[in-house]
Amino acid sequence: MKLSDLLRLGVCVAVLLVAGLALASPPEGGYHLLKKYELGAAPGGKEYWDYITFDASTRRLYISHNTEVKVVDADSGAILGSIPDLKRVHGIALVPDLGRGFISDGGADEAVVFDLKTLKVTGHIKTGGNPDCIFYEPASKHIFTMNGKSNDATVIDPATETVVATIPMGGRPEYAVADGKGMIYDNIEDKDEVVVLDSRTNTVKAHWPIAPSGGATAMEMDVKHRRLFIGGRNKVLAIMDADSGKVLQTFPIGDGVDTNIYEPETGLLFTATREGTLHIFHEDTPDKFSVVETVKTEFGARNMALDPRTHRLFIDTGDFAPPAAPTAEQPKPQPTPVSGTFRLLVYGR
């Protein structure tokens, strides 16, 4: 090989190495508040909110708000409509191919079906007690609800709107994720473990302890690298191998975690907590994560959704009144949301 060829080869190798390092580095610039949208009071005046679902195809946010689902334009913050007359909304799952959405109504022990175009309720499906997390699993083409009161999962055929199975979970199920190939991973909040389900057979395949994390609530997955991200109410984030159940790394986080979001394009992992902290981590390698920054948000801002196009985060919260004096029935009273202060916060770079 000629000297000139060697020099050209060396330059190419150097360029590739630099490019590789750039891909492995977290994006520059900190996350901060960009916009704030007021969303108004919940019907009946009692404030409660839970999961947010973002539909990238329509640029819509479906936001649980006590007895209704608010539908919001993700770009303008305008309220496009609502799905009212529910009991206590937790989550919203969308099945665009059928033109239907499914709401977990924990107060009614049912999944409520609605039309994605008209937002009109079209059906009610009985589930286990207090359905919380709800999601569409693509391999089986079924809807799953995780039922916190009856300690089981309800499996629904969204095409026929019928229950096809009920799966005992062995504890109180919280948030779950699917790998797209048939496996589901669910937090068992009161047992400090992850349950692995096979959606093709509707059977439990494994129970994995999550120590030193505990009180598992938030769950997310890096599907490509087979990593689970488990947020615990004992203020520990655990990173787990989705094939072996081994806990690979842990990080301290704020109090009251409820949502984890992983962004494959940037390798960023976001964790939102009730105390008003947004923790941001970076996947340096599948076996090594690092802290990027911790952003101060607002108290109660623990539920969020990600827009993968703009890389912006949508987080909801409201104002809170001080907790009442302790009583025998309520030895540890919590701050209570103030009616009419519900709002959507938009964070980005």
Predicted regions and their residues:
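Bacterial N-terminal signal peptides that target proteins for export
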Residues: 1-11
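Predominantly soluble domains enriched in secretory-pathway, periplasmic, or organellar proteins
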Residues: 5, 20-349
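Bacterial N-terminal signal peptides
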Residues: 10-20
